[in-house]
Amino acid sequence: MKKLILVTSPPACGKTFISKQLAKALNHVVYLDKDTLIPLSKQIFAVAHQPYDRSSIFFEKYIRDLEYRVVLDLAMEALEYDDIVLINAPFTQEIRDLDYITILRAELKKKQAELVVIWVDTNPKVCHQRMIDRASDRDMWKLNHWDEYILGVNFNPPLSLKLENQPDSLLIFHNSSNEEFEESMKTIVAQLEAAVADRVEIPRTRY
């Protein structure tokens, strides 16, 4: 059984670093990052004569869902050619929408694939500092309105996604310290390796 892995969490929890390390550790992986689409999204802002603001109503209405649709279309195509596709993206709304997840799982089943959600669990104070340190233009509104922003962010894992008959349906990656990262990395790589090996013969991971 092939796997579509979504590495998800609120911004600045460490998704990108974790996603890349997981992709390096596993075999037969296609790595996709939704942020790769940002240059195209910036052009939409420019053509529409809108200020570049990924927290704006314009972004939510015309760009956000399109980015997710494109990266998922790429993932579905990639599953035709490899065993695992890993997407680095927040999916903050989608993973709380059980209808969305049900439809996605049904589409994956047609490709003999399963959905794996890896939730990156990070202390909000750590996320705030990481956001300051990375100084990205996409975080400007969040940092300037931190108290307002943080009230609307759900840092709880989406436990409703856990399936009894699929142990790797929801995996929690703790990432508030280097020690948590190392322990979670070893544990989750082993879980993913075992889940894929149960169905597909692949070499051992390199982690």
Language-model features and meaning:
Residues 1-4, 82-83:
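Pre-Walker A (Motif I) flank of P-loop NTPase domains
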Residues 7:
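Hydrophobic anchor at the beta1->P-loop junction of P-loop NTPases
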Residues 10-11:
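The conserved Walker
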Residues 14:
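Conserved glycine(s) of the Walker
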Residues 17-70, 76:
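Conserved substrate/cofactor phosphate-moiety recognition/catalytic segment
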Residues 62-111:
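Glycine-rich phosphate-binding loop used to anchor ATP phosphates in small-molecule kinases
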Residues 109-131:
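Conserved phosphate-donor/acceptor-positioning beta-strand/loop module used by diverse small-molecule
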